[in-house]
Amino acid sequence: TRLTCNGVGIDIVYKRLLVNEYLPIMEEQPDLLNAYRAGAICMVNSFRGKLVHKKAIFAVLTNERYRYLFNDAELEAIAKHIPWTRVFRDEQTENKGEAIDLVEWTRANSHKLVLKPNDDYGGNGIFIGWNSTPAEWDAAIAAALADGDYLVQERVKTAKELFPMLTDKEGHWEMVEQLVDLDPLLFLGEV
């Protein structure tokens, strides 16, 4: 199944289309998926990359019940680099070795938590506990539970660096402190 556009064959596709954007049109527009399944194209940012796009991977990495999956070096790296995260639902879990009721603990610890959708980007749907009133945080908790696909995550210090920024149309610029947000890409196992 060769993928073409206006009669020109396509061998490589850099996919920017999100899976949740493709699902509603997949039946009417199957050519991309068919070519991918047939191995007729090389797809950069393939559908298999969706796993790391899902933020719930952090809940697996930081949950005590999955510690047995990792060796000591991996556990050390996880503890150092991955914020404590849980799929947000009405359940018992642990935080720093202490048994907690996740919903009530989340309600009581808004000062250090965020609620975020598992499958979104660009800050969409995020509730920031430390910027919320108690009533807003209660509403966020209710919305996240009703949605069913939210995470609760502990606040981490966000890195800041100086970056050049244009200040006018004449090309003047200045160094401005900005948050650092890296989106590393992997290709054949290399960053």
Regions found by a protein language model. Name each.
Residues 1-191:
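Domain-scale recognition of functional cores that engage charged ligands
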